[in-house]
Amino acid sequence: MTDTRNLTQLGSKTQAPASPEAATLETAPFSRGDGPAAIVRFTCPEFTSLCPVTGQPDFAHIVIDYAPDKLLVESKSLKLFLTSFRNHGAFHEDCTVMIGRRIVEATKPLWLRIGGYWYPRGGIPIDVFWQTGTPPKDAWVPETGVPPYRGRG
């Protein structure tokens, strides 16, 4: 049975953190066993942050793939972490990379990649990609399934 004693957010009424810096990513133990590494995917199709200059909302479809080693990121804490960006002002690139780095810091995975598919602002969609290296050998890493942005063209 998984040891959940260190989880404080799961199963509790929890306020959304005021900022990404105030958010806590919690982890649970993972036994990966023998064979190819497992790949875990989180998809956040309605991610929101604020433009650091205008304060206007920015929206993205975020896809996170990682190969856990000994720790899993607990999904409620991840949800609260992602929600904490709602009132956070940062550029698309900064938000995307910050998310990836925080998960790496918390879980120390074998591998992680994140894709931030940002909806157009000023007529330009911005896609941001970051990863820690090459995927583990023989791991099944499916395509993200996010099509390139197409307007009415």
Curated annotation (Swiss-Prot):
Keywords: Cytoplasm, NADP, Oxidoreductase, Queuosine biosynthesis. Substrate binds at residues 73-75, 92-93. One of its GO terms (cellular component) is cytoplasm. Pathway: tRNA modification; tRNA-queuosine biosynthesis. Residues 1-17 have a biased composition (Polar residues). It catalyses: 7-aminomethyl-7-carbaguanine + 2 NADP(+) = 7-cyano-7-deazaguanine + 2 NADPH + 3 H(+). The keyword Glycoprotein does not apply. It comes from the Bacteria. Its EC number is 1.7.1.13. SUPFAM superfamilies: Tetrahydrobiopterin biosynthesis enzymes-like. GO terms for molecular function: preQ1 synthase activity. Residues 1-23 are annotated as: Disordered. Its main location: cytoplasm. It is found in: Cytoplasm. The keyword NADP applies. The active site is at residues 51, 58. One of its GO terms (biological process) is queuosine biosynthetic process. Pfam families: QueF. HAMAP family: QueF_type1. Belongs to the GTP cyclohydrolase I family. QueF type 1 subfamily. Catalyzes the NADPH-dependent reduction of 7-cyano-7-deazaguanine (preQ0) to 7-aminomethyl-7-deazaguanine (preQ1). This is NADPH-dependent 7-cyano-7-deazaguanine reductase. It comes from Chelativorans sp. (strain BNC1).
